[in-house]
């Protein structure tokens, strides 16, 4: 019985809700799914089991939520030793509570990349990574609505984590009770205790085997975490326990000590070069031949005067097989070097593929009562000269089709924010957002929540946006279910973190699912509106995945960090 209970904790589901046989009988299997089911998902033997916070009483407050900051050290090796000692001290002098969460953190004088630290940890699972994008050059509307006067120097640029102090996962759609279960472990007095993770694009859809370990949603507070700041770093260890879940402080400390013994302090700097792999095959779902009729079918519905549909986003899944395995962290590091204006993320539960992304799009950012979102739509390539760049930008700004697509997204987000905010500001009305390979129409929106507990309503109000689903959302979602023959999983879903005083979520586009022996699934989508052309939309899909495919050439190397 003990081993059975352990397996349910591993799956991250309530035993009463979970029925493996029903899941395996119900999903539609793609070629990736069929191949995936024949490959063992237990390659990563060094994984840490902990408690599923969704199974606790979300109404019962924890006994303690605290952060203990130790003295600054010069290196990651010194930080690791300091934490090992601090964890031992915690074991000998335990807090007198039946439940709680304690973060021990050691500042490091050196600035070291969080992604480099994660790559050095030799695939310890679960693992997570979240890197905030640079918003330099854009107005910070959130500042006008947030009461936070603190310095951004105290906010990590990137965060990498291994192990799980506590995780949250279920097959049922993310609910208000699930959100409260997460919030139970967070506090504004411990701002760096955060739950990193994401939600499926469509929580009501059938889960394909490649996505089964992510559940309908998946969040984790890492056991061991490396935070990268503007000029320094920090190593942290977290223990969480709840006797009601049969996960005691002693259990939590023993699990953390086991993980700490595996932590490597020998960190090599990844050169941000293309990977040395060759793509030996590529298969699109849908194929180009099937995609054109799907777009035309959507256009017929949009043109129908009896249909409320004005936009639908049709996605594509591209499976690539390579001559050697793709290292998802090295691939993400390569994407990061040209994606400073984007979020980078990695989520990998035990036994699962790695879901990585380099997304330019923010779903929302909350600081206390202030919340901001943005509209991002329409796509053009970057120009190869200043003259060509200006021509493309002018075409993007004056295109009626692109203006329609963008306006649908912006006005939909404005109306949704109005339902949860006292007032909403839009600035600028329409501009061009330039990324490394593409450019989009862009606008920022911000407002003030009536209360911080409205955070759950931000998610339900804003996701999915017309930029990744369509408008009206429900009509578009139904059409997507009818047309698309693959499981989006967390592609185009909210990816980010919940924190005590601050939360931030990106939209999980420009993303890929990477698994050993199975290559990768690369996802992309385009918005179909009146005036769309199937050939142009297919070319846009190719453009959007180019950042992934073009980064698979040449060889990546390591440089030692002194």
Swiss-Prot record:
Per the entry, what span does the transit peptide take up? Answer: 1-55
Q: InterPro entries this protein is in?
A: ADC_synthase, Chorismate_C, IsoChor_synthase, MenF-like
Cite the annotated pathway. Siderophore biosynthesis; salicylate biosynthesis
Question: Which superkingdom?
Answer: Eukaryota
UniProt function note: Isochorismate synthase involved in the synthesis of salicylic acid (SA) required for both local and systemic acquired resistance (LAR and SAR) while SA synthesized through the phenylalanine ammonium lyase (PAL) pathway seems to potentiate plant cell death. Also involved in phylloquinone (vitamin K1) synthesis. Has no isochorismate pyruvate lyase (IPL) activity.
Reaction(s) catalyzed by this protein?
chorismate = isochorismate
Q: Name one GO biological process term.
A: salicylic acid biosynthetic process
Question: Which locations, inside or outside the cell, does it occupy?
Answer: Plastid, Chloroplast
* Family to which this protein belongs: Belongs to the isochorismate synthase family.
Q: What Gene Ontology terms describe where this protein resides (cellular component)?
A: chloroplast; plastid
| Assigned EC number | 5.4.4.2
Example GO molecular function term? Answer: isochorismate synthase activity
For the protein in the UniProt heading, the enzyme class is: isomerase
Per UniProt, the keywords (alphabetical) are:
Chloroplast, Isomerase, Magnesium, Plant defense, Plastid, Transit peptide
Cofactor(s) named in the record = Mg(2+)
Looking up PANTHER family in the UniProt record yields: ISOCHORISMATE SYNTHASE 2, CHLOROPLASTIC, PTHR47253
Q: What is this protein called?
A: Isochorismate synthase 2, chloroplastic
One matching Pfam family, short form? Chorismate_bind
Description of the deletion phenotype: No visible phenotype; due to the redundancy with ICS1. Mutants are not impaired in salicylic acid accumulation upon induction. Ics1 and ics2 double mutant is seedling lethal due to photosynthetic lesions induced by the lack of phylloquinone.
């Amino acid at each position: 019985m003990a081993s059975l209970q352990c397996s349910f904790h591993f799956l991250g589901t309530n035993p009463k809700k979970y029925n493996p046989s029903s899941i395996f009988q119900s999903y539609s299997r793609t070629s990736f799914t069929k191949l995936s089911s024949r490959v063992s998902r237990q390659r990563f033997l060094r994984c840490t089991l902990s408690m599923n916070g969704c199974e606790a009483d979300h109404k019962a407050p924890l006994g303690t939520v605290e952060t203990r900051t130790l003295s600054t050290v010069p290196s990651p090796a010194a930080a690791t030793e300091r934490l090992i000692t601090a964890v031992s001290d915690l074991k000998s002098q335990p807090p007198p509570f039946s439940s709680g969460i304690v973060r021990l953190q050691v500042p490091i004088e050196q600035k070291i990349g969080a992604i480099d630290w994660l790559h050095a940890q030799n695939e310890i699972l679960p693992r997570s990574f979240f890197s905030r994008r640079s918003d330099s050059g854009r107005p910070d509307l959130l500042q006008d609505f947030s009461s936070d006067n603190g310095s951004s120097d105290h906010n990590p640029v990137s965060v990498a984590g291994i192990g799980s102090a506590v995780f949250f996962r279920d097959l049922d759609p993310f609910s208000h009770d699930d959100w409260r279960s997460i919030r139970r472990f967070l506090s504004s007095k411990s701002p760096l205790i955060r739950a990193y993770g994401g939600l499926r694009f469509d929580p009501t859809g059938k889960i394909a085997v490649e996505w089964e370990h992510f559940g309908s949603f998946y969040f984790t507070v890492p056991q061991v975490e490396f935070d990268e700041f503007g000029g320094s770093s920090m190593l942290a260890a977290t223990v969480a326990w709840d006797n009601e879940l049969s996960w005691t402080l002693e259990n939590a400390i023993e699990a953390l000590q086991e993980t700490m013994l595996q932590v490597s302090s020998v960190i090599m700097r990844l050169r941000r070069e293309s990977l040395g792999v060759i793509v030996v095959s590529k298969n699109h779902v849908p194929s180009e031949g099937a995609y054109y009729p799907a777009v035309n079918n959507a256009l017929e519905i949009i043109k129908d005067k009896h249909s409320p549909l004005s936009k639908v986003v049709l996605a594509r899944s591209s499976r690539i097989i390579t001559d050697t395995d793709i290292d998802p962290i090295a691939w993400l590091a390569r994407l990061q070097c040209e994606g400073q204006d984007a979020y980078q993320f990695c989520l990998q539960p035990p036994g699962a593929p790695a879901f990585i992304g380099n997304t330019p799009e923010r779903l929302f950012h909350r600081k206390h009562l202030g919340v901001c979102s943005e509209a991002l739509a329409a796509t053009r390539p970057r120009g190869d000269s200043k003259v060509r760049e200006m021509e493309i930008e002018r075409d993007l700004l004056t295109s009626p089709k692109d203006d329609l697509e963008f306006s649908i997204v912006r006005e939909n987000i404005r109306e949704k924010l109005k339902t949860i905010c006292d007032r909403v500001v839009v600035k600028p009305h329409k501009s061009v957002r330039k990324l490394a390979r593409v450019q989009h129409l862009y606008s920022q929106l911000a407002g003030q929540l009536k209360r911080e507990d409205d955070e759950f309503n931000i998610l339900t109000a804003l996701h999915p946006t017309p930029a990744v689903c369509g408008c009206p959302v429900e009509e578009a979602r139904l059409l997507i279910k009818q047309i698309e023959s693959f499981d989006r999983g967390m592609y185009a879903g909210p990816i980010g973190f919940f924190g005590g005083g601050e939360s931030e979520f990106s939209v999980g586009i420009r993303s890929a699912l990477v698994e050993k022996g199975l290559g990768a699934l690369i996802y992309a989508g385009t918005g179909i509106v009146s005036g769309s052309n199937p050939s142009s939309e297919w070319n846009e899909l190719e453009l959007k995945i180019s950042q992934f495919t073009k980064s698979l050439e040449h060889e990546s190397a390591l440089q030692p960090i002194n």
